[in-house]
Amino acid sequence: MALKIRLRQQGRRNHVVYRLVLADVESPRDGKYIELLGWYDPHSSINYQLKSERIFYWLERGAQLSSKAEALVKQGAPGVYSALLSKQEARKLVVRKKRRAYRQRRSTQREEAAKDATK
């Protein structure tokens, strides 16, 4: 079950309000959701309210952000977004180190095989 943090449309005609929810990828836009993570009202002076701790919790567990939800989290909870980015960068560094070590092992094995073949 893939999870996504996305906006769910609410409100009435000409005054749409959105809820930031955690939902299954296959559920409809305005359908069933797992957890309410905040809201966004583009017409109000107080535009949004987000539950930063819960957003971070679900992002750590593998939930993905939709593009609009990502923009809202960047604006409303920059600490959560920067922590997520730093975690992703740390993972990339680990993968790069492993890849470098693997390439180095392979090149030394090839060199040794070439030396053995010439003997």
Curated annotation (Swiss-Prot):
SUPFAM superfamilies according to UniProt: Ribosomal protein S16
Signal sequence segment: none
Region (Disordered): 96-119
Family to which this protein belongs: Belongs to the bacterial ribosomal protein bS16 family.
The keyword Ribonucleoprotein is annotated on this UniProt entry: yes
GO terms assigned for molecular function: structural constituent of ribosome
Protein name (database record): Small ribosomal subunit protein bS16
Native organism: Chlamydia pneumoniae
NCBIfam families on file: PRK14522.1, S16
